[in-house]
Amino acid sequence: MFEKINYQRRRFLGIAGMTIATTQLGRFGSANAQSSQAKPKESVTPQPGALQSTDPAAIRPFHINIPQADLNDLRQRITATRWSEKETVADSSQGVQLTTMQELARYWATDYDWRKVETKLKALPHFITQIDGLDIHFIHVRSQHENALPLIVTHGWPGSIIEQLKIIDPLTNPTAHGANASDAFHVVIPSMPGYGFSGKPTSTGWGPERMGRAWDVLMKRLGYTRYVAQGGDWG
């Protein structure tokens, strides 16, 4: 049975997501991606010191480096938001209430710590590869347990891979969390097209079926011929 979608939550997150999108946090495209030739193993991942590859289908290491100037510019633009008039009703029937959005903007401009999040992201192995003409960014963490099951996890809308950071260690290292080695997974978490550090589609058509095919290409490119998939919300 499909999980019932909370449309009120979606409306709220949608507006919040669009606000973030217009500010283009850190201009994700400025993150630096480097490429290397993958050495075939059970799972194909770049090896340190490997030769650079010009093949867009190669699995390339991806390094996050958001300039401080971009963060400062983002905060300034959030602070300079010109707000519309207050809604004419006391409930959310006309959308997210103005006071809620203003409080969110205040938090983003003054309290939100991108560097803290960036540090968590940098602690994980990031990669990028081109699939169907689009750069796809993903996290790939292999379990040290034998016979771990490959798992690809897809975030929802609006959302990002940050939602899945907390599940990586319990899935890849279950014995450290009171579970059995037989519960282990090799975890792959891609950013959907147009999200995070993945490329932005320039045409329509990137629906669930096309993304599903792209994810299959990704898993096979990583050397996984047998895997399971998980998604939440619209993931």
Predicted feature residues:
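An N-terminal hydrophobic leader/cap segment in hydrolases
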Residues: 79-126
